[in-house]
Structure formats: C-alpha cells, structure tokens
C-alpha cells in the first residue's frame, strides 16, 4: 500500500489539465505511441468539440521512480468549469492529494480557488504546478507570488513545466511520489468501497468506478450495496490504463472499475458504499453532500411517441451525472415531458446536447428558471421551480428569490466595467480586495440574473480575463412578478416567466416583439400580449394575410365590391374563432434571449 498514490488534477478552465494528464500517461507508458491522441481522457465527442472536460475519468499507471521503486499512480482527471464542480468534489473524495495546475501566463483564477478550497477542506495535500512556461507571456515568478498571496500555499518551489512540450513533467511525478501521502486503510478489515461514479453500458449494465478504502475485493465475491441492502455478484473488475483492463483482485487503496450485471439504474447510487455480503462493514463511508440544482427547465420531446425513450435516456444520464434532477411534468402547449434541474446553463446545454446526440431525441426546452420561495397568505412555505406553479397573486404574502454569492477575480483595468455590470444585474457589493494587479470582488447577485447570461456578459466586458465562481447563499424577499404571454387571448403556460417588477415592462415588450417576428402570419390577425395578472403591459399584432378579392371586378357598381369585402370579412371572423396558432420551436427559445441583444 505504501507504493500507491491517489491524486487528481484541479485547475481553472483551459489551464492545461487534460494535456498534462496526456503527458503523464505517456511517460508512464499507459498507452502505446500509436494509441496516444490529444486529450485521451476527454472521451465524449462533446468534450472534444468544446475543448472542455465534463466527466471525471480515472487512470491507473505504474511509475518507475528515481529511487528505484515502482509506484502505482491512480489518477482522476476533473472538469474545471463552474457547472461541473460537483464532479470535482466527488473525484477529490477518492484521493489523498491534488495537483493544483496554474497557467503561468494567466495566473490564479476564481475556479482554481474554489476547487483548491474544496481540496483543503477534505485535508488533501495540494501540490502547486506552474504550467505553460513555454509561452512568451509566461511570468512564473509573479504567478508563484499570486498563489501564495491569494490561495495561501507556499509556492516558492512549485514545479515549473510545460505540458505541451513535456518539459518538467518528470519532476511533477517525483514530487507526487514524495509529497502525497499513501492511502490509509486496513487491508485485512471488512470491505468498504466508495462508488465515485457510475455509467450505463448497453452490454454490461451498470459499470461503477470505485475506490477501495478498507479490505479488498475479489472477482466472484458477493457484494452488498449498503443503502439499498441489495446483493450482487462481482462479475468483472479491473483498472483503467485508460483502456479497461481486467484484474482478479482490487486491494486496499486502489481505484478501479466493477461490473455486477446490475440492470436497475438505481442499483448502485454514486456516493454509496459497497461491502461484502458475508462479512459486511458496520457503517457506510461518508458520501458526498447532495447538490441542489440551481436552474430548472422543462424538456419536452417534439413527438409524443418519444416519451418512453426520453424517460429511459434521462434515467441512464442521471446515473452518469448525479447532479441531474428530473420529474414528470405536463404542459397544455407542449404535452408530456420532464422538469429537469441543472447546476447551470452550460450544464443544461450539455445535457440537452447529450440527449439529442447519444439517444437521437428531438427536444423543446422551456425558459430556464430558478427556485423561488413563496410564503402564502395561509403562512405556508412553498418552493416554486416553474412559473406555472406560482400561486395566484392574491394568495402570495411574499415572494423570495435566491441570492448567489459571486466571487470574481479580474485585472484592475476592467474593474469599472464589471461593477457596472453587477449593478445592472441588481448586485450588492460585499467585499473587494486588491492582490497586486488582480482584484477579488465579492457580490451578492440574484441567482436568476447569474443564471441567465451573467457569465457570458462578464467574459465579454472583461475581454475574457475575469473569472467567476458562485454558490447559493440565501432566499431574500423581492418584488417579483409573473409575466404571462397571451396569444389570441389564450395563455401559453410554456412562455410564462418570472422577473423583477422593474424589468417586467421592458422584458414583456421585448418578448412580445420577438414573438411577433417568429410567429408565421396566418389568415387572421394574431394578438400577442404580455400581462401581469389581468394587467396588459405590452401588445403587438401579427397582421393577417389577405387575398385581393376585388381583382376580378372591373368598374361597375360599388355594392358588388362591398358584398365581396363583407363576405371576406365574415370569413376571417369565423376563422379567427376556430383558428389555432402553431408556435415554432424558436418561439420557446426566444425567451432565453430576451434582453440580450438590445442592451
């Protein structure tokens, strides 16, 4: 056991985690030269296209150190994006140490801090690494000072490397072996294995990634899932060298995969503990804290025949992504679908794209909303995650919206622009600290504003230099209203949105104008209105198409023309009474972009 090292790499987006992991795999000979590809561990197409890591991946490598010993390195690659911070905390729970990778040109960013604090809370040994020293803009001295100043780790002897060229990577491995402690645990005690991650394989059933904390697991053992009490046979187990390799035994301290032919998706929940059926452990391991989704949206299949397939797909995805929440919902406009909860907008996009790609579904998404806390006049507390669930106005005593605490790190010259943006988003400044040329800003901003487009706007006002980390702080009373959209005097539930009263007029008008462009013209006038309760705040009309019925009349009596025009008018009137308006998919997406272009 003293030759095992479990570690993960934490860093901000684009600071070179995945490239560094490629080099480590190459040096340890995990894959032959022919199989080596850039970003080996980003195995999803989506990850490669967007250049981001979404899922944590694990690899077991053998490293021949300079002291003549061979060490087993279990290494878990983690995502850097704020929406996937849950993946990071799960990966860290399986490790004893972490490499903190910082770009020597960009310096410390908000995400680096957030993930680093997570690691420190779990008492992991953090080893700082300065990456990208081959860049002309690199300034390792300044960045080393920044790490000490902002993060509070001694970085004077931080390893300097360039993951792209491979300079300094062997030093990192030596440092790992030296500084990161070997796993603790009792190899002879009863088995306790933590499920770090699981995914669904069409041939094998549920595959789980596990970390053995105590005891050992052999092929053919009967294992018991502690939370459900179900027992399964350990059919196959082994390690990743990124490829799956079968082994007969996983011993204490190792990280590996396990297949028990579990067909039920909820059979082995992430964060659960496995133990042996014949000699069970007394108590389960402390799992992970459950994360609460911050953003909710309705997802509906375009054709109702896909509903079953959609439900199965969501089940399989939620197994792989424990932070996804879903429950069935029906809408008068869109039929049956699911209300899904996500950690952020990027998370929502990724899930939607994965559903469309991996499961061939066509989906409509409603506008994302956050969770509001409503105190009714009967003094009950209700949590509302969709505008259609909001009680009637006269039953609401007060409406509280979630407030997010946002930590931003940015260069001084962009401070003015960013503060202006925060004020526009109804933010309250709580703290501001200068670190050299960097400023650390803390604001309390309503979650609804953060979720909508705050991250994109922050990046564009600061030319990409500002970085953001946010978490839910509390609910706070606020003057929020529900804006309904009426089309031909009928409310469309899927188009409703909850917004602050100050912005309601503006957002209502904007939405109505956008709808007018998107709804195709019909044979009759279509009135589009935005309303708060019964009070109409904006209206526009999609003009009817009309045929020129007088084309065949030449001169002659005017009463003939009047008769034809009157006949047309009556026809239109009758049509309007029975006519339905088909809403295109773009109309639902328009809500997402309300208020983006005009500001």
UniProtKB/Swiss-Prot annotation:
GO biological process terms, semicolon-separated: positive regulation of translation
Membrane topology reported for the UniProt record: Peripheral membrane protein
EC assignment: 3.6.5.n1
Disulfide bonds: none
GO cellular-component term (any): plasma membrane
SUPFAM superfamilies for the chain: EF-G C-terminal domain-like (SSF54980), P-loop containing nucleoside triphosphate hydrolases (SSF52540)
Molecular function as annotated in GO: GTP binding; GTPase activity; guanosine tetraphosphate binding; ribosome binding; translation elongation factor activity
Protein purpose: Required for accurate and efficient protein synthesis under certain stress conditions. May act as a fidelity factor of the translation reaction, by catalyzing a one-codon backward translocation of tRNAs on improperly translocated ribosomes. Back-translocation proceeds from a post-translocation (POST) complex to a pre-translocation (PRE) complex, thus giving elongation factor G a second chance to translocate the tRNAs correctly. Binds to ribosomes in a GTP-dependent manner.
The family this protein is said to belong to: Belongs to the TRAFAC class translation factor GTPase superfamily. Classic translation factor GTPase family. LepA subfamily.
Official protein name in the record: Elongation factor 4
Organism: Yersinia enterocolitica serotype O:8 / biotype 1B (strain NCTC 13174 / 8081)
Lineage: Bacteria, Pseudomonadati, Pseudomonadota, Gammaproteobacteria, Enterobacterales
